[in-house]
From Swiss-Prot:
Name of the featured protein: ATP synthase gamma chain
Subcellular location per the Swiss-Prot or TrEMBL entry: Cell membrane
Pfam families with a match to the protein in the record: ATP-synt
Function: Produces ATP from ADP in the presence of a proton gradient across the membrane. The gamma chain is believed to be important in regulating ATPase activity and the flow of protons through the CF(0) complex.
Amino acid sequence: MAGAGLVTIKRRIKSITSTQKITKAMGLIATSKLRKVRKKLEANNKYCELFSSIVNELAMEAEQNNIYIKGNKSNKKLYIALNSDTGLCGGFNANVVNELNSIRSKEKEDFLLITMGQKGKMYFRRLNYNIESEYIDIPDVPTIKETEDVVYKALELYRNGEIGEINIVFTKFISTIKQNVIVEKLLPLEVKKVEKRNFIVKFEPSADEMIEDIVELHLRQKLLNCIINSKVSEQSSRMTAMDGATKNANDLLDELNLQYNRERQTAITQEITEIVGGAEALK
């Protein structure tokens, strides 16, 4: 019986050791990917902030009844949900899904959804969301190219009056231990009043002529920034999850090795007792 127990424990130790090697490797890969995409986020944050300030200046000068500022007559909303293409990243995907579930429970009218990421596509289909478009296979270090089709589709719906608001639901990177799910409105533009200045901003051609073209660039830049935030958060969550799994495997291996040694000691003691008992019987 003791021998059978030792074999079972040894098999479990071997299985957990193999799993530990996988989680450790995945943690190292996530750390490497995190480092790369985080550098891009730092650079993109500065560019996005500057670009947004220019768009705000433009919006202040444009006619306020412009559809990109005042909005159109549609009450229907569009949400763009950013998820990962792969799993094993803790609660990263579940948090985005939960946020949209919360929004759906509060909204009076059903909204349209654009999903980005294989996991989002899978979850939202299962939950019977009104999905307009689906996009998968987003690179680990995304570029502006990944925003083209999504923004084109969203703007087409907005210009046709099928939707009156474009929002994005994504995970904003705060630090390696903190990421928050954010809902950000992209359209209509929210004009932020700036402090009184001692200079005048003049646009040529006029702000109204420019806004039609620049709003697409603005949306693409904002979406790219959100995707990069999402990718950094994903890799950070995966790194944390894999580190936790590796530590749990270590703890479990310590317990199993202790249990194995106890079982082995018991088996040896039993064998010695049987040998001594047999020798005594022969006297």
